[in-house]
Design a protein with these regions (language model features):
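Conserved C-terminal portion of the radical SAM core fold
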Residues: 1-50, 100-115
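Proline-rich intrinsically disordered, low-complexity coils
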Residues: 4, 14, 61, 85-87
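Compositionally biased, intrinsically disordered/low-complexity regions enriched for serine, proline
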Residues: 11, 58, 82-84
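Short secondary-structure boundary/capping segments
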Residues: 24, 52-59
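Radical SAM enzyme core and accessory elements
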Residues: 49-54, 63-168
Length: 168
């Protein structure tokens, strides 16, 4: 089909490691035709199974309510609450990976050392983001098929593109 769509990635699940996040970036890189990518931090809402897992493993106090000095807009999108032992993600990892995930997902792995450096180097981050935005963003929303044919999603050969059809 030629319907525009976006991919959504959540970072910071209980027991998640940096390598798991990079596996998600690899999966997004292999995806074809998306015209948007949304990355968010995991939020542990009351009554959810993932909050229960975080509490049972003592990553999150049972009475936790989302709040903190760093939150903006109610803290729902930029405040990560759990504390896990290494090798699992740490708060600083989550913030850096949310910031740079689109770069990991867009660029080939041969450039991931640069992306890793950009997690803490703002000048390099801006340079890579400028390149990403120039190549990926378009003035209009495109459908998946158009985006693939114009090669403005992660780099793919048109011959490897799946043909989609709507069955009624």
């Amino acid at each position: 089909s030629n319907i525009p769509y976006s991919l959504n990635v959540i970072i910071g699940m209980p027991f998640e490691t940096r390598e798991m996040v990079l596996d998600s970036a690899r999966m997004v890189h292999q995806s074809k035709g998306y015209d948007g990518l949304t990355i968010g931090m995991m939020q542990f809402y009351h009554g959810t199974e993932l909050r229960k897992i975080a509490v049972e493993n003592e990553f999150l106090p049972d009475d936790y309510v989302n709040s903190g000095e760093t939150e903006q807009g109610g803290g729902y999108l930029d405040h990560w609450a759990i504390e896990m032992p290494k090798p699992y993600l740490q708060e600083s990892d989550v913030h850096r990976l949310v910031k740079t995930f689109a770069l990991y997902a867009y660029f080939d792995e041969s450039r991931w050392d640069e992306v890793y450096q950009s997690e803490t180097d703002e000048t390099l981050y801006k340079k890579l983001m400028d390149e990403y935005q120039r190549e990926f963003f378009s003035d209009i929303q495109q459908g998946g098929k158009d985006r693939i044919l114009n090669k403005t999603c992660a780099k793919h050969e048109v011959t490897s593109t799946y043909e989609w059809e709507v069955l009624t």
